[in-house]
Amino acid sequence: MLRSIKNILIFSSLFTFIFAEAIPLGSKIPLPEIKMEDISGKKVSLNDVKMENGLLVNFSCNTCPWVHAWQDRYNELAKASAENNIGFITINPNSRNREKIGEGLKDMQKFSNNYDHDFLYTVDEGSKLAMAFGATQTPQVFLFDSNGKLVYQGVIDDNPRKPKK
């Protein structure tokens, strides 16, 4: 009986995740006050990071091959965001067995150091933000304008390995 209930719960949570949809364009920033820990131990919220012209939220992780393919552009993206007065934050939504799968805070610190990241890389405890955003893949970005309204959601660019100019 317990096994059946467990299987039903697992199936229903997977079913929900698979069919989750990203928030629609025009949506306000979800859960902007939730504090997340970044790799330096600092606690930040999306409101803390948002700048005059908006906010770029990047859902990412350490172990996804697609994330690795885009890594060389993360610092460029953070720099371009800052130059345009747009806040930039990368959020790791992986929560289940985080440490066992290479997604723990120490793993994130090592990963970030290996790529010389120069931006906030935070932990989304319990995947609360990922679920609120409807983020279902990594990397996946959400760009909000100065009013905190979503104007773009999707991939970083047209090709993870060789972007078109």
What are these regions (language model features)?
Residues I8-I18:
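Bacterial N-terminal signal peptides
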Residues M51-L55, N84-F88, D116-L120, S146:
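Loop/turn elements at helix/coil->beta-strand transitions in domains of secreted/extracellular proteins
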Residues N47-H68:
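Short active-site neighborhood of thiol/selenol oxidoreductases, capturing the structured segment around
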Residues L143-K165:
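Thiol-/selenol-based redox modules, centered on thioredoxin-like
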Residues H68-N114, E125-A130:
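Structural microenvironment flanking redox-active thiols in thiol-disulfide oxidoreductases
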